[in-house]
């Protein structure tokens, strides 16, 4: 034991509404250096601050969240092709 911290990934399946990001989100996020890709809407009780979403075999990094008044959380993500996504 070297006292090294080894991070282990825990996966959880949840139902989500999946859409492309709006043009205005694409433009504003692009100005901040993000490359917006997809928006996922999940129930607030199912989201615990995770920074990575996997959908259809592709990993997306969460760059922004929004708690909607209907009890859901909107997860705005970017596709980091060829990059390591940090959890």
Show which residues each predicted segment covers.
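Short, conserved turn/kink motifs that form compact alpha/beta structural patches or helix kinks used as
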Residues: 4-87
């Amino acid at each position: 034991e070297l006292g090294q911290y080894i991070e282990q990934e825990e996966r959880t399946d949840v139902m989500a509404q999946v859409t492309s990001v709006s043009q205005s989100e694409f433009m504003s996020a692009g100005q901040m250096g993000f490359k917006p890709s997809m928006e996922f809407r999940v129930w607030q009780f199912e989201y615990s601050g995770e920074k990575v979403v996997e959908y259809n075999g592709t990993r997306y990094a969460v760059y922004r969240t929004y708690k909607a008044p209907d009890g859901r959380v909107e997860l705005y993500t970017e596709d980091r092709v060829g990059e390591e996504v940090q959890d």
